[in-house]
């Protein structure tokens, strides 16, 4: 049994907990830390785990194999470094961290202490994403020219419920580095190259109380020639015909609404795959457990997390300076 310490017992932790329950024969939470004592106690009772209000104390006292970081964005770097220094493997919620300096600290800590870090990029475990990656790597649509990703919904946050997400200092920006992080790592996964430059147009259509944007449209260039287009928003639902993701190549294209996947080739060949949906958090936790058990590389490590952060920072800089900004190399 892989023993995990949960760091942060807030909302997203519930999705992770469901994942652990789905793999209770392999991995489980034995300790939980949250700065709010009532939350720590409640999660501890829920999980039969030892509660702490300080994750550093938990790391010092508990016999743990790994930690699962479910903290507000601005607290990720410190928790990652502390866990790595304690020799614990790490599953970290999005985003990995917020700045290039923080990314350098994360990479250095993970490398120095020889621990595994997996980014909690749960949408990679959608069956349609796995099938699209398989088709692209098999050359079904030929050399890829363009990838598009979308993740938009009508968010009913208000100032009383927005919490730390309303502040750029604690969130790292606005919607783009939050929900927009999902279509960014999906873009990276499907494009198959390293990001080299990006720009964005940011908007605040509806959630005016936020310091950051509530919507973003991003362009990304990769070193293999792929150009990515990304749309994400908390202000509105996408149009009914909008694909979740698509890719266009020299031989044809593929697209998906998230539950089915179709490709159409210039030769006239077409095929549609109807794929059974899965709980992506359950699949994510299972993958983390298997990676630790077999000592194999997770689907996305700190390297992909840093690449995603590089895209986002370049997009923010491109928007600020009204230029196409280079993706920083960390």
Go through the PLM ranges and name each one.
Residues 184-260, 285-296:
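Contiguous beta-strand/loop segments that form the cofactor/metal-binding neighborhood of enzyme cores
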Residues 123-209, 322:
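Predominantly a Rossmann-like dinucleotide-binding segment in NAD(P)-dependent oxidoreductases
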Residues 1-47:
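N-terminal Rossmann-like dinucleotide-binding module
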Residues 53, 91-92, 117-119, 230, ...:
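Hydrophobic residues in well-ordered beta-strands that form the structural core
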Residues 274-286:
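Active-site loop of classical SDR/Rossmann-like NAD(P)-dependent oxidoreductases
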Residues 16, 47-109:
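Beta-loop-alpha module in the N-terminal Rossmann-like domain of NAD(P)-dependent dehydrogenases
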Residues 105-122, 142-147:
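Rossmann-fold dehydrogenase core element
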Residues 7, 66-69, 223, 290-330:
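C-terminal helix-rich "cap/oligomerization" subdomain common to oxidoreductases
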């Amino acid at each position: 049994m892989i023993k995990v310490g949960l760091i942060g017992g807030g909302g997203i932790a519930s999705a992770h907990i469901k994942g652990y329950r789905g793999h209770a024969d392999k991995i489980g939470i034995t300790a939980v830390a949250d700065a709010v004592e009532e939350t720590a106690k409640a999660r501890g009772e829920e999980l039969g785990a030892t509660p702490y209000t300080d994750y550093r104390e938990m790391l010092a006292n508990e016999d743990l194999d790994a930690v699962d970081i479910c903290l507000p964005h601005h607290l990720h770097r410190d928790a990652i470094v502390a866990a790595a220094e304690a020799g614990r493997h790490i599953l970290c919620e999005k985003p990995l961290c917020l700045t290039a300096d923080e990314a350098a600290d994360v990479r250095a800590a993970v490398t120095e202490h020889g621990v595994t870090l997996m980014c909690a990029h749960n949408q990679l475990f959608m069956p349609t994403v796995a099938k699209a990656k398989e088709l692209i790597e098999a050359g079904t649509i030929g050399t890829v020219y363009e990838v598009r990703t979308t993740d938009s919904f009508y968010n009913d946050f208000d100032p009383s419920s927005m919490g730390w997400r309303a502040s750029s200092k604690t969130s790292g920006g606005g919607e783009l580095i939050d929900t927009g992080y999902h279509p960014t790592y999906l873009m990276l996964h499907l494009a198959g190259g390293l990001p080299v430059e990006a720009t964005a147009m940011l908007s605040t259509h509806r959630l005016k109380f936020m310091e950051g944007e509530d919507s973003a449209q991003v362009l990304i260039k990769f070193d293999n020639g792929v150009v990515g287009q990304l749309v994400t928003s908390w202000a509105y639902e996408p149009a009914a015909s909008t694909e979740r993701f698509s890719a266009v190549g020299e031989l044809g294209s593929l697209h998906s609404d998230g539950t089915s996947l179709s490709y159409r080739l210039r030769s006239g060949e077409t095929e549609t795959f109807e794929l059974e949906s899965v709980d992506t958090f359950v699949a994510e936790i299972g993958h983390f457990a298997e990676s630790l058990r077999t000592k194999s590389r997770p689907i996305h490590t700190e390297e992909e997390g840093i690449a995603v952060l590089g895209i986002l920072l370049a997009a923010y800089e491109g928007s600020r300076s009204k230029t196409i900004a280079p993706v920083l190399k960390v």
